[in-house]
Amino acid sequence: MKRIFNIGAICLTMAVAATMSSCSDEFIQDKKNYSNVSSEIYNYYSGANGRLNECYRITLPNIQAGASQMWQYNSLGMADNHSQSTEEYRNFSTFVDPQVTLNTVTGTSGAPGYFGSSWSRIREINETIEGIQGSTLSDSEKDELLGQAFFLRTWCYYLLFRYYGSIPLVTEVQNPVPESFTPRSNAQECYDFLCSELDKSAEMLKKRTVESSWSANDWGRVTTGTCLALKHRIMILWASPLFNRDNDQSRWTNAYNTIKQEIGTINACGYGLANENAPGVNGSGWAKMFLGIVNNPEAVFVSCYNKNTPDLTPDYQRNNLWEQQIRPANTLGNNGKTPTDMIVDLFPMKDGKRPATYDSYTKVEASAIAYDAEHPFMNRDPRFYRTFAFPGEYWRFNGDPNTSTSANPYTGDKYILWNYVWYNDPANFDNVMSSDHFGADNLLTSVHGMYIRKFSDDLDVNATPNYNFNTAGKNVGFRECMTSTMEIRYAEVLLNLAEAACGANQMGEAVDLLKRIRARAGYTADNNYGLPANLTGDQAACMAAILYERQIEFAYEGKRFEDMRRWLLFDGGVGLAGAGAKALTGWGGNTCTYLGFKPFVGQRRDEFVFRLQNKYNYTDGQSGRTWPFTAGDNTEKKDETNPDPILKSNMGGLTRATRDAYAVDLSETIVNKPLDEQLENLKTFYDTYLVRKKIKGDAYDSNNTPLTMSWNARYYFWGFTQGEQINNPNLPQVVGWEDYYKSGSNGTYDPLTAEPAGTTTE
């Protein structure tokens, strides 16, 4: 029988909001409700553009979207189900939880439902495409609008392709009736379609974005370069082990030749490695790159925001809350985000090599610099200091967090993060399960051992912040922030070319591209940009170095989960055949062994704090007292009222001034000393007062035994949920996942080996 898919049956009705955003307020405010309109609107450029803007609104990745908004949910570095499947965040996601097995036939522990939530926006884009094609607009106007619309539809299909391996390809508006069927295309057909659509989009947009460019008011729209960059990402995905189980070399060669040929066109659209020739001090050029708004050359595919206040008429507020979420509580932030011990400990050392204590990517040369976990800030990659924040580090901002209800010790321009903790019960000093601690400087119970600092609008690198700082009202703190999020950065364009070059056995070119990435971060030719000397002659080592570089460069950007999936890093791919899927025969049958990567299964992630040494901890219950400052008072109170043990004369004997003299200033302007000298000074403070304490991250079982991550090989391609199967009885279930119409026995459809769409099978 012919296997077909009922697209109409699951189309959801979209609640159309009145706004969409971009870096330009004019672009934002033009996103009106153009959803329910007649075909006449397409005969006017403004009307057709309004419909296109609605497609942008429902399609662009949105850092504020969550699991309930699958059509825009693209894991932009949040502590979500994707990132919690990687080294970046603790807490088992449903994919790696050893106590949960995802399934597609019951109401609990269900597989992700990304499939069904996508079709309403695809239908919306198809309606827009048909309306523009049938309009009386000029050919140049049609090309400009259709090039964008085809890209947005392809973006939707790309997300489905990478998760499910293959999908139905619906390119016209269908009536929502059972007779409207579209077969499921196999993986090869989907790949060919995606690349063809992006080539078409790129060509349509050439006149507007290569020969010319978008105005500042249209910044955020896609370009020919955006189309090609996404195509290159898809080509790398197609060549990777997830889709390329036999390691077909022609896929790597094709990707390499195509990307190398087309990267000049991407450059012609105005894209490039931001601050490539201005690395600044201690990674400042790299950090500043994330804060550019209009005409940021790094931003190849970007989602834009504004810093509008709420309750305006009309309300065009579209804020990026990341800055608010990562800032500590004593800055009026949301208490911050916490990295795992794993991600902190694996960042490269100052010489660019992996720490010798990191037992993964062992094909890559280890550093000769000893890693000291008690002082993790010593001798690290410049990006470490811009990705994480630790006790004793300036992290300045534009604002004053002292209010009538929040009496904090610093104004923003002088802010130092002091997030060490203490306990009032000796039984908790080294108790991994206990987080009953109190933090310095009014952090009290709202404290973390280290903070994620990535993307932060640091006053040291951006004198004109992208946020409004508020001490009252609905948007307290940093909520009104317009920092953009970049789904595709130019750094990825280069690293995609590097990966393709390595796969095509052009390791010398791959290494040259790595050098450009490293130079922007602050490395120099003096030590070969921190790269091992053997990469040009060892393909496995070169590929491992590229993936390691991606992990560091793109930490907390929502890229790691997909890299781990496409390179089968959870188990090396050894479980595929057992799940009924096509076995891995390339890369020696195990990508983890090939790369020297320690399989993620069997590992766990914890966190840590820096607590005061035993002699400085309370035993009299004083720790939890109210912080002894009042509004507008930044002076230190008497010892007897200060709950911080080391700021009491009879214990630590420090004052705030003497403590602050240990703080590290990455700009090297407040503390006029080189970073290495400052870090040695801070190390002295740690040696005198602090000790690193491990605290529970991932779950323990009922017997308080630490659990480790698991992975089912069928998760590499996702199955369709029970609801999706009920709505589409002819939809073939993915191999290894329960088939509702076969009483829960496993599906047999493998996207990689399935016959082309429309093929009749018995």
Region spans (language model):
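Conserved, well-structured interaction surfaces
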Residues: E40-N53, R57-A67, E87-Y164, P178-D192, ...
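An aromatic- and glycine-enriched ligand-binding surface/loop that stacks and positions planar moieties
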Residues: S24-R90, D199, G225-L228, R233-S435, ...
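Flexible, polar/acidic helix-loop-strand segments at domain edges
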Residues: T362-R489, W737, K742-E762
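Acidic, glycine-rich segments characteristic of secretory precursors and extracytoplasmic regions
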Residues: K2, G8, C23-M78, T101-N103, ...
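Short coil/turn linking the two alpha-helices of tandem helical-hairpin repeats
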Residues: F161-R162, S166-P168, T209, L237-D246, ...
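Long, intrinsically disordered, low-complexity segments
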Residues: C23-S24, S118-R121, F193-C195, D218, ...
